[in-house]
UniProtKB/Swiss-Prot annotation:
Transmembrane domains' residue ranges: 18-38, 54-74, 79-99, 133-153, 168-188, 208-228, 245-265
Protein name: Mas-related G-protein coupled receptor member A2B
UniProt-listed PROSITE patterns: G_PROTEIN_RECEP_F1_2
Principal cellular location given in the protein's record: membrane
Pfam family name, one: 7tm_1
Species of provenance: Mus musculus (Mouse)
Bilayer topology annotation: Multi-pass membrane protein
Similarity comment: family membership: Belongs to the G-protein coupled receptor 1 family. Mas subfamily.
Source domain of life: Eukaryota
GO cellular component: a single term: plasma membrane
Keyword Ligase found: no
Annotated localization: Cell membrane
C-alpha cells in the first residue's frame, strides 16, 4: 500500500518531483550565471559560444521541468490543450538542443586535438555561431513536425503513417547525436591518454570530459528511453512509474551539473578568496596547458576592473 500525504499525494511521486524542483532551482542559478558571464563579460571563442548556448538550453529545460513538476504537485491543469502542446514542444526543443550542443562541443574538441594545425588555420571563423543557429532551427523544426503530425492531426483523423515517420526521424536523429558524441569522446580520450603523441591535458579538456561523463551517467538513460518511446510508442507502456521518475531526476541533475563542473575545474588548485566567478569560468575554459606565464596572466587579469 502506497504512503500518501494529506491531499492524496503519493510519497513516491512527491519526493522525485521535489528533487526535480530543488535541482532545477540550483541549475537555474548556475546556468544563468554562466550565460551572463559568457554573454556579457568574457571574450567569446569557438567553444564558449557552444557553452553559452548549452547553458541557455539547460536553463530553459530546467525552467520547464520546474513548472511541470509544480503544476503536477499543485494538481493544476494546463490552461488549454494548445498551451499544453506548446509547452511540451518547447521542452522537447530545448532538450534535443542540449544534446546537440554536447555533440557539437565534443566533435569540435576532438577536431582541435586530432587536427590542431588544420583547426587553427583553416577552420571558418564563424563556424560555432552558424552551427548553434542550425542546431536551434533543426531542433525546432523536428519538434514542431512531431507535435503537428502526432498530436494535432492525430486527434482529427487517422494519421499513423506520418506520425510514425516523424517518430522514426526524431529517434534516428537522436541516435546520430549519440553516435557522434560517443565516437568523438573516445577519439578525444585516446588522443589525450594513449599512444606516443599524448597531448598535455588542459583545464578545458577536463571540463569537457567531466561534462560528457556526467551526461553518460545521468543524461543518457533518458535519451535511450526517448528513442524507444519514439520507435515503439504504442507498445511502450511497461516502464515502471518509479523508474521513469528516476530518469527525470537524473536528467535534472545532468542539466544542473554543468555549471558546477565549470566552477569546480576553474577553481581547482586556486585560492577561491582571490578569484571572482568570471576568473573561475575563464580558467575552466582555458585551452592551453598551465605554465608560469599563464598563472602570471591570470593574476594580472584579477587586478583589472
Amino acid at each position: 500500500m502506497d504512503e500518501t500525504l494529506p491531499g492524496s499525494i503519493n510519497i513516491r511521486i512527491l519526493i522525485p518531483k521535489l528533487m526535480i524542483i530543488i535541482f532545477g532551482l540550483v541549475g537555474l542559478m548556475g546556468n544563468a550565471i554562466v550565460f551572463w558571464l559568457l554573454g556579457f563579460h568574457l571574450r567569446r571563442n569557438a567553444f564558449s559560444v557552444y557553452i553559452l548556448n548549452l547553458a541557455l538550453a539547460d536553463f530553459l529545460f530546467l525552467l520547464s521541468s520546474i513548472i511541470a513538476s509544480t503544476l503536477f504537485l499543485l494538481k493544476v491543469s494546463y490552461l488549454s490543450i494548445i498551451f499544453h502542446l506548446c509547452f511540451n514542444t518547447i521542452m522537447m526543443v530545448v532538450y534535443i538542443t542540449g544534446i546537440s550542443m554536447l555533440s557539437a562541443i565534443s566533435t569540435e574538441c576532438c577536431l582541435s586535438v586530432l587536427c590542431p594545425t588544420w583547426y587553427r588555420c583553416h577552420r571558418p571563423v564563424h563556424t560555432s555561431t552558424v552551427m548553434c543557429a542550425v542546431i536551434w532551427v533543426l531542433s525546432l523544426l523536428i519538434c514542431i513536425l512531431n507535435s503537428y503530425f502526432c498530436a494535432v492531426l492525430h486527434t482529427r483523423y487517422d494519421n499513423d503513417n506520418e506520425c510514425l515517420a516523424t517518430n522514426i526521424f526524431t529517434a534516428s536523429y537522436m541516435i546520430f547525436l549519440l553516435v557522434v558524441l560517443c565516437l568523438s569522446s573516445l577519439a578525444l580520450l585516446a588522443r589525450l591518454f594513449c599512444g606516443a603523441g599524448q597531448m598535455k591535458l588542459t583545464r578545458f579538456h577536463v571540463t569537457i570530459l567531466l561534462t560528457l561523463l556526467v551526461f553518460l551517467l545521468c543524461g543518457l538513460p533518458f535519451v535511450i528511453y526517448c528513442i524507444l518511446l519514439f520507435k515503439i510508442k504504442d507498445d511502450f507502456h511497461v516502464l515502471d512509474v518509479n523508474f521513469y521518475l528516476a530518469l527525470e531526476v537524473l536528467t535534472a541533475i545532468n542539466s544542473c551539473a554543468n555549471p558546477i563542473i565549470y566552477f569546480f575545474v576553474g577553481s581547482f588548485r586556486h585560492q577561491l578568496k582571490h578569484q571572482t566567478l568570471k576568473m573561475v569560468l575563464q580558467s575552466a575554459l582555458q585551452d592551453t596547458p598551465e605554465t608560469a606565464e599563464n598563472m602570471v596572466e591570470m593574476s594580472s587579469n584579477k587586478a583589472e576592473p
